[in-house]
Amino acid sequence: MNSRLVLLLAVSVALVSAIAVGNRSSHLKKSKECSSDGHTERCEYTGDLTVKTDSTCNHSTYIMTKVTPPNESPSNGVAHCRTAPCNSEDYADVDCLVAFGADNIAAIEKQ
């Protein structure tokens, strides 16, 4: 009887875990555009991430401008991210690590 209880608990945990995860897909689109005036180079890194989990869909944007050699701007090299439900223009600022994850940020910045 004790082994049946353990088996029942294991099956219950597996079912709850499968329900919690759901069907998830994501698509990352990234780009890097640079320009130079002969003294400095200005590069803009952008990323668009769409994440769908079951019936929920979110779209996040990433933008970072990096000037080299570094300038005095406090925003130089600092990423700004926003997120919104898919098919909405009601974006809210969000922490980039939360919206994109470390792997996607690395992919955007290593172009």
From Swiss-Prot:
Keyword Cell inner membrane: no
Location(s), subcellular: Secreted
Gene Ontology cellular-component terms listed: extracellular region
Primary localization class, coarse: secreted
Signal peptide residue numbers: 1-18
Pfam family, one: DUF1505
InterPro entries associated with the record: DUF1505
Keyword list, A-Z: Glycoprotein, Secreted, Signal
Residues with attached carbohydrate: 23, 58
UniProt family annotation: Belongs to the UPF0375 family.
Protein name per Swiss-Prot or TrEMBL: UPF0375 protein ule-4
Originating gene: ule-4
